[in-house]
């Protein structure tokens, strides 16, 4: 899969302009939140700028920050990898919808090791993040990698320092595959990490792993590839070693029942070559739009992304949503996103 080598900055900005009423009217949108989808949002915004002239400014500040900003009405849309509960959505008057499917991978810095050479399973990975496995040549790791020469090197564990949807996805997986992690740490955008150096954003973790020999850190796949980081294979729910690819992220989503809720948990799914740490990512928007022109432009941007952004997402190794899910999202926009008079914005 061809990977775009664009550097992902913390602030992703693109310039666009389009209006239903005048080609000279400029629409400017602001969004903030998850760093997990920031590479594809950057690419979409850049292309949308060239095609329409509209402005979209997206700040990758972490999912927790995105939720806070949309609740505070300081942005036009928020972004989070951790879906809000139905109760929280109702309380804040928000609607959430998915955009793309991606994967969290384990990036490692072991001298001489290439991507896909090291295999880990969920139990072993959890024990690393619990601080129980401290060296790369530990017996548990060696057993999964017969024939691979592992260094007697300390493992430098890297995790997120900020509230993070990527952490939510990662800890959701660990809670399914490591009983001690489930009982003592649990799942969340922020947890009480047993050990580890904290990095801000996916790019912060990638930078730590790049600098620290012996490091391991969890990042969205595009960040590992853009930073030329080696990443591991994982043992799937079917007991097979699998690689992170756009196709295998899509495989993890095949069994999901999207008709009941958009908030699907795609971690540790069974299915041919399903990547174990797969997730969709979400946009948050107010249902009752006080500035309907802004709400309309948000929907236009993501409608455009659904129609024309699939190849760009795939080039960055995200999987597109199934067409049936996109149609469900559009139908939900019509019934949920309205102006103060109750008129649908889509």
From Swiss-Prot:
Subcellular location(s) per record: Periplasm
Main location: periplasm
Keywords: Periplasm, Phosphate transport, Signal, Stress response, Transport
Keyword Transport: yes
Keyword NAD: no
Triggers of expression: By phosphate deprivation. Positively regulated by PhoB and negatively regulated by PhoR.
SUPFAM superfamilies assigned to the protein according to its UniProt record, in alphabetical order: Periplasmic binding protein-like II
GO cellular component, one term: ATP-binding cassette (ABC) transporter complex, substrate-binding subunit-containing
One of the GO BP terms on file: phosphate ion transmembrane transport
Membership in a protein family: Belongs to the PstS family.
Role this protein plays: Part of the ABC transporter complex PstSACB involved in phosphate import.
Subunit structure: The complex is composed of two ATP-binding proteins (PstB), two transmembrane proteins (PstC and PstA) and a solute-binding protein (PstS).
Protein known as: Phosphate-binding protein PstS
Organism: Escherichia coli (strain K12)
Gene from which this protein is expressed: pstS
